[in-house]
Every structure is written in C-alpha cells, then in structure tokens.
Amino acid sequence: MTINTTRIETMLAERGLTKAAYAKRCGISRQSISTIVRRGTCEPKTAGKLAAGLGVPVAEIIEERS
C-alpha cells in the first residue's frame, strides 16, 4: 500500500509523538517506521497497525490511486 507519509508525520506532530513512541504504540520497530516513512509503502497489515497507532481509519493514512 502507498502511505501518505506527510499526513502521518503531521499527525505525529499534532499528537506530540516521536517515531519511537509511535512505533511502540503500533507494535513495530522504530526502524520499520523509518523505513516505511522513507519508502512510502507497506503491507496492508502494517498499514492497519500504523492507523491504529494514530487512532484513525486506514483510509486516512493511505494515498488514493488515480
């Protein structure tokens, strides 16, 4: 899945979360968070964890394909 990394980083800033704290909330490693943000993609299961860590639906963090 293509992830809207700008949206994720904005949400992290709004919530005052570091990537390390976010990773802990998501149940994945900080290194994985960094890789996902750098590449802008992840598996659907991981996208679910990322969204849950922010308390939002997956639709809010994925890029829409045209």
What annotation goes with each model-predicted range?
Residues M1-A21:
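A short, Lys/Arg-rich alpha-helix, primarily the initiator
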Residues I28-C42:
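Recognition helix of helix-turn-helix/homeodomain-like DNA-binding domains
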